[in-house]
């Protein structure tokens, strides 16, 4: 019994016959209503409007008037009897009102809710002129006779209807156009096309399948339909899941579901995605507008170039390739941003080829020019073909060009490794290289996941080798990783698979590569995903060579045969990189970069090499000049220059940490780089006369750019410092330091074992207020070089506090093998020393060591010169002095003016007197002191003559005419003989000689 009958108990009193008669009348009325709805010329009853009164009273039984006297004037709709099945949606229910079947909403219906699809059509008919009242011009034709849409009354106007039936995609849809409250009756309006309404989800009928809409549901433009047909035939991989609304393809169904749930643009659309697309308002068109041809994307781009960039998001094309790690990018800006990863911004070094730049802009320009290529058609790793998708194959010409470049870059071994004959043509195509490495090698991880009838091209990896290693054959042992061959039958068209070579060991781990292989060391760096899990990537050796090139330039002489020592393989080299200086292997290259920048023992001066490398260096007698006895204390004189780090590294040994360095307690500027960096408030570099705003910048300058960065810390005996005084007798130093590269670059070089200079010439200036003068006025003040066992090899800094016995100094040029005066390089120490002693025109005469040191204003920073100063001017700077300023006169005046008396002296004498202790390990060595810089008032006391500059400052270089003989009459003082450049200004010439002269070229290569 319905709720209507329960609310009116008087209806229960009716007899069973009356109830059956009423039901028959209702059924007849419902069938009559259906006939009127389906008849072409039958007008819609006026009761279609919910608010209009019913035209006919409901038929009743003969006893009806008596029983219905107390009812309301307007009867309420009656729910259909339970015997009638309801096949419509759950939100609606059928009711009978005024003898007509109506549809009532059970719940509140929001605008845009749709039901469908239904099989049928909407036909248009012409209204008859004899009709007295208006009738709808459309007729609803349904295939299903029992469809609930037939019971919906049709409204004459859109204002009267709250739902509409429209045709879309060969089917009928019923959509709510106005909000319908719960219990409201529905009235429908037939339309040919759907109206624009906000998008809402579509409710499918239960009888319809829940599979995605077929492809013909999409309404495409002609060019979009053409593109869709091409894609339908091109995509043969069944594992690709496309989003029809966004045009994005996914290789995982879970990714597609997540996209549809959270990111899809049509997730709030109504009807099908095509309906939501057609409901959008048309956008303004521009003259040069380009529309994306991909289905359902329809993104408008203002220009053809922007459309090309946008199309890469659909095709996966990444034309900009980083040649260092073979990463591909869609835009040039992204690739340039990525290139910054491969640089060391502190030292301005390119991690790939070792290029050193003074400015960041030059370094970035180098990276973009040499290590980035634009290769159209390159595919990124994300969009590389899958297991069932055929990979792109290189045409024969591209393969040949790739082989040509590979042969030119890596030499004959690379060609033999690939199994292809090397081509002698030097013309290279870097785009072919990027296409081969990026498009082919990146397809390997996805291609190996499953089989396919058409195999892709075999993977290929690049190996960088030096040209000087022809004897190292690419042989793989049984325990070494094999070639990364795909697990499929190779096609005859596919190129031969490349073999991943095991890495060659470093020739001399503590030394730099030979000059011939500097251009190829680290030219390419393969990422980890190119190799299989068992392969040994070449990143370790490449990065090791780069670090050796940058930080160990001075250690070339550690092994004369460095080029021929690479005979072993590295079968168990793990992925990542290895720091050969610290004996640490990193699994991540980024960790290796951080280690090299912040923690590596080789980040300081090139003299700092780990002591662990000493046993691998050649023996000491091979490094020492002939005729000098070997030092019996082997641990104290390391055979290789790499051992000099033991003292500079801080506490390399327990003795060093306990006893400390000889100058640890003083503030002498001659201490090591670590002593200068210990003071966090220190920002002034006195060697270069540069003040920095931050201590970190100062530290970087001292490590990589300072003029004294190659100076080894001086050795001093562990003797108690004597009181400062002008008459302190200088004692011969048992271990004088090796003359640094910067000091002996263009100066007159002296031979080892010369007699010491006279003691009066080395008395320190009494007026010097330097804080370290007290500790430096002892026996360590004299720069004498006495022969002894210390002349065998370089200085062992870790043992310098324990050397009280006198001994001969080490060879003056033990760590240097290039004569900058003659521009000749030597690969052995013996040949270099013989050249400097007998053949070099810049070498001083045999008795030059007995002469006092004079200061050259043209050599930074006021460097002392032993021997004939005028001869040094002539050989090093191309200066010719006139007759009044003869060499003997200057030398005759020099010893007399170097006494402790502060009396006025000639112009050239104050500089030798003040620079002598600096050359002989006095209180004024190369390195700046940890304490504050000297005050301006103290400078005149050290150098009494007003024309002379201060002894510790580089400002004297700016006024060479006052500290040297008068300007020459011939004007040659503004001409640089080495660079063949004439200068119009003397200050410009001095700046050139100090910073830019070609004589500094060897020093800038770290």
Swiss-Prot record:
Query: Mind naming one GO cellular-component term on file for this protein?
Result: transcription regulator complex
Give me the ranges of the annotated region Disordered. Answer: 1-93, 114-133, 384-409, 438-460, 473-515, 605-681, 708-810, 889-971
Q: Where in the cell is it found?
A: Nucleus
Detail which positions bind Zn(2+) 3: 685, 688, 701, 706
Q: In which tissues is it expressed?
A: Mainly expressed in hematopoietic tissues. Also expressed in adult cerebellum, stomach, lymph node, liver and pancreas. Expressed in fetal heart, liver and spleen.
Q: Which molecular-function annotation in GO is an example for this chain?
A: transcription corepressor activity
Q: Which region ranges are annotated with the description Interaction with CTBP2?
A: 794-800
Q: Which positions bind Zn(2+) 2? A: 579, 582, 595, 600
Please tell me where Zn(2+) 1 binds in this chain: 243, 246, 259, 264
Residue numbers binding Zn(2+) 5: 976, 979, 992, 997
Q: CCHC FOG-type zinc fingers: which residues?
A: 235-268, 571-604, 677-710, 811-844, 968-1001
Residue ranges, compositional bias (Basic residues): 1-13
* Comp. bias (Basic and acidic residues): 15-25, 66-79
Which residue stretches does the UniProt record annotate as biased composition, category Polar residues? 121-130
Q: What residue spans carry the Pro residues bias annotation?
A: 42-62, 617-629, 715-735, 754-769, 925-950
**CDD domains according to UniProt:** PR-SET_ZFPM1
What family does the database annotate? Belongs to the FOG (Friend of GATA) family.
Q: What is known of its domains?
A: The CCHC FOG-type zinc fingers 1, 2, 3 and 5 directly bind to GATA-type zinc fingers. The Tyr residue adjacent to the last Cys of the CCHC FOG-type zinc finger is essential for the interaction with GATA-type zinc fingers.
Q: What the protein does?
A: Transcription regulator that plays an essential role in erythroid and megakaryocytic cell differentiation. Essential cofactor that acts via the formation of a heterodimer with transcription factors of the GATA family GATA1, GATA2 and GATA3. Such heterodimer can both activate or repress transcriptional activity, depending on the cell and promoter context. The heterodimer formed with GATA proteins is essential to activate expression of genes such as NFE2, ITGA2B, alpha- and beta-globin, while it represses expression of KLF1. May be involved in regulation of some genes in gonads.
Assembly and binders: Interacts with corepressor CTBP2; this interaction is however not essential for corepressor activity. Interacts with the N-terminal zinc-finger of GATA1, GATA2 and probably GATA3.
**Protein's UniProt name:** Zinc finger protein ZFPM1
Annotated gene: ZFPM1
């Amino acid at each position: 019994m319905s709720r209507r009958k329960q609310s009116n108990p008087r209806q229960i009193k009716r007899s069973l016959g009356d109830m059956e008669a009423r039901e028959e009348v209702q059924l007849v009325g419902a069938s009559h209503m259906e006939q009127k709805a389906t008849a072409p010329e039958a007008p819609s009853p006026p009761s279609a409007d919910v608010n209009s009164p019913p035209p006919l009273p409901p038929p009743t039984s003969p006893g009806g008037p008596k029983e219905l006297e107390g009812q309301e004037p307007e009867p309420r709709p009656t729910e259909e009897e339970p015997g009638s099945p309801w096949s419509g949606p759950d939100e609606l229910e059928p009711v009978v009102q005024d003898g007509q079947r109506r549809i009532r909403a059970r719940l509140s219906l929001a605008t845009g809710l749709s039901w469908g699809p239904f099989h049928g059509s909407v036909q248009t008919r012409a209204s008859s002129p004899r009709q007295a009242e208006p009738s709808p011009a459309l007729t609803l034709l349904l295939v299903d006779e029992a469809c609930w849409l037939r019971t919906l009354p049709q409204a004459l106007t859109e204002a009267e209807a709250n739902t509409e039936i429209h045709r879309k995609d060969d089917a009928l849809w019923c959509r709510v156009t106005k909000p319908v409250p719960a219990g409201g009756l529905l009235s429908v309006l037939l339309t040919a096309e759907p109206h624009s309404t906000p998008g809402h989800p579509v409710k499918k009928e239960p009888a319809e399948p829940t599979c995605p809409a077929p492809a013909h549901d999409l309404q495409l433009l002609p060019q979009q339909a053409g593109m869709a047909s091409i894609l339908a035939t091109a995509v043969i991989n069944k594992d690709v899941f496309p989003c029809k609304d966004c045009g994005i393809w996914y290789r995982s169904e879970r990714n597609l579901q997540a996209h549809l749930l959270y990111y899809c643009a049509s997730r709030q659309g109504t009807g099908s995605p095509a309906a939501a697309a057609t409901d959008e308002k048309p956008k303004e068109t521009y003259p040069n507008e380009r529309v994306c041809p991909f289905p359902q994307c329809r993104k408008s781009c203002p220009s053809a170039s922007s459309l090309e960039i946008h199309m890469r998001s659909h095709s996966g094309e990444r034309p900009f390739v980083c040649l260092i790690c073979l990463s591909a990018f869609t835009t040039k800006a992204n690739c340039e941003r990525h290139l910054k990863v491969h640089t060391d911004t502190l030292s301005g070094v390119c991690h790939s080829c070792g290029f050193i730049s003074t400015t960041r802009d030059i370094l970035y320009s180098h990276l973009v020019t040499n290590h980035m290529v634009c290769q159209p058609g390159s595919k990124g790793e994300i969009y590389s073909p899958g297991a069932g998708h055929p990979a792109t194959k290189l045409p024969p010409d591209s393969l040949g060009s790739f082989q040509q470049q590979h042969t030119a870059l890596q030499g004959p071994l690379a060609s033999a490794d690939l199994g292809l004959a090397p081509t002698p043509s030097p013309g290279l195509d870097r785009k072919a290289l990027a296409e081969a490495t990026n498009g082919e090698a990146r397809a390997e991880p996805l291609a190996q996941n499953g089989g396919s009838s058409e195999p892709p091209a075999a993977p290929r990896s690049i190996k960088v080798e030096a040209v000087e290693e022809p004897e190292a054959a690419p042989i793989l042992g049984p325990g070494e990783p094999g070639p990364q061959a795909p697990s499929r039958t190779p096609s005859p068209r596919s190129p031969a698979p490349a073999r991943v070579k095991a890495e060659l060991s470093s020739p001399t781990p503590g030394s730099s590569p030979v000059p011939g292989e500097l251009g190829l060391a680290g030219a390419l760096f393969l990422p980890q995903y190119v190799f299989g899990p068992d392969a040994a990537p070449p990143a370790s050796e490449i990065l090791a060579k780069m670090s050796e090139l940058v930080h160990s330039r001075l250690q070339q002489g550690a092994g004369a045969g460095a080029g021929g020592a690479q005979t072993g393989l590295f079968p168990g080299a793990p992925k990542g990189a290895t720091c050969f200086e610290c004996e640490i292997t990193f699994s991540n290259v980024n960790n290796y970069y951080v280690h090299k920048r912040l923690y590596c023992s080789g980040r300081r001066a090139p003299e700092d090499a780990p002591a662990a490398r000493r046993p691998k260096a050649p023996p000491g007698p091979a490094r020492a000049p002939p005729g000098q006895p070997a030092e019996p204390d082997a641990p104290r004189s390391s055979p290789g220059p790499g051992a000099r780090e033991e003292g500079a590294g801080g506490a390399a040994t327990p003795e060093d940490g306990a006893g400390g360095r000889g100058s640890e307690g003083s503030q002498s500027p001659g201490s090591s780089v670590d002593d200068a960096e210990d003071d966090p408030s220190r920002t002034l570099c006195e060697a270069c006369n540069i003040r920095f705003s931050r201590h970190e910048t100062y530290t970087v300058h001292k490590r990589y750019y300072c003029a004294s960065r190659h100076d080894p810390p001086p050795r001093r005996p562990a003797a108690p410092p004597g009181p400062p005084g002008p008459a302190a007798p200088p004692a011969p130093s048992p271990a004088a330091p090796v003359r640094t590269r910067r000091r002996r670059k263009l100066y007159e070089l002296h031979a080892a074992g010369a007699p010491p200079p006279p003691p009066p010439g080395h008395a320190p200036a009494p007026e010097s207020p330097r804080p370290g003068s007290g500790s430096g006025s002892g026996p360590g003040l004299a720069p004498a070089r006495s022969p002894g066992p210390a002349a065998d090899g370089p200085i062992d800094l870790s043992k310098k506090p324990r050397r009280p016995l006198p001994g001969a100094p080490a060879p003056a040029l033990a760590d240097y093998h290039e004569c900058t005066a003659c521009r000749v390089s030597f690969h052995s120490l013996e040949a270099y020393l013989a050249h400097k002693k007998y053949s070099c025109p810049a070498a001083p005469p045999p008795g030059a060591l007995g002469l006092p040191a004079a200061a050259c204003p043209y050599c930074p920073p006021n460097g002392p010169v032993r021997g004939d100063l005028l001869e040094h001017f002539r050989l090093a700077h191309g200066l010719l002095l006139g007759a009044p300023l003869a060499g003997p006169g200057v030398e005759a005046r020099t010893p007399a003016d170097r006494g402790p008396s502060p009396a006025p002296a000639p112009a050239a004498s104050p500089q030798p007197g003040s620079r002598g202790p600096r050359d002989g390990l006095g209180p004024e060595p190369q390195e700046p002191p940890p304490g504050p810089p000297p005050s301006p008032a103290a400078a005149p006391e050290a150098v009494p003559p007003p024309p002379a500059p201060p002894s510790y400052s580089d400002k004297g270089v700016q006024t060479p005419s006052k500290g040297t003989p008068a300007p020459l009459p011939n004007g040659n003082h503004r001409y640089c003989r080495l660079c063949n450049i004439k200068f119009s200004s003397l200050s410009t010439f001095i700046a050139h000689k100090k910073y830019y002269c070609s004589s500094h070229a060897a020093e800038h290569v770290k």
